[in-house]
Amino acid sequence: MPSPPGDPQKESPDSMAVEIGAQGIEALPRRVDRYGKAKIGALEVAQYMAGLPDLQRTAQRVNGCGDYLVFRHYFTVDQVKLHGARLCMKHLLCPLCAIRRGAKALRAYLERWECITAEKPLLRPFLVTLTVKDGPDLAERFNHLHKAQRELWKRRQRARGSPLDGVAGAVWSYEVKRGSGSGQWHPHLHMIALAEHQPDQVELAAEWHNITGDSFVVDVRPIDQADTAAGFMEVFKYAVKFSDQPPADTVHAFLTLGGKRLLASSGCFRGVVVPESLLDDPDGLDDLPYVTLFYRFLEGKYALKGGAHA
């Protein structure tokens, strides 16, 4: 059965934040539990798709995702890496792949941010949110948002005076969900904008309304540089939020937006490469001794089925 709102079986988008740091053996049970909850969500989506004739092969892929997980514990430095797994790579459908994909992107852009701030210490990160009016047609609303965002960015490039003139680089993602009041599709955009001074929210709202014709709700706030990951995560949890919906909405969003570019960047954030593999990077640990831990998903949770030294 689908998990009701607030059910702890649903994986929180915040869970991907812990994916980017070094994790020791004591954290492994919690990590495996997170993946188990995400696997349950994937099974719900797969079950829904199994009843749709054109999606049965995709349903099988998602259903089998995360059937097993292989970890390596490098015990001399107490680090645990996800070394192997059966993954469907459908991160807009599968909560497990969404967590891994989001964490990979978060780590890649945080590493670029560290390089940027070392070269340009006056730049500060700001979280910018842009919304458009809710509507019943997801494709139409998404295209409206996408077109408006492109026009906003073009106005900055034309150097004719824009609230984003001081932005040296940005990375943004598109997120969709049902509006809490309307029940209609509510696409919106989260952006990390790098600038020396905070973009003016009032001016941005006026320009956004001029572009969209129906929307003026924007938000601009500084990101706490003592916890940059928390602010950046708002952008990179977009895939997790896709799967944090009823399966019917998740699948509809996937079919509607599956071919769209939902993560983009510009300026000094351009060119960041997010690894395709959803497994952990070895990070130079390959030559160290390790213990292999093999987990299988059985009866609604992961169970340790064996281990071996190497």
Q: Over which residues does each language-model region extend?
A:
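Right-hand nucleic-acid polymerase module
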Residues: 1-185, 195-310
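Cys/His-coordinated zinc-finger cores
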Residues: 191
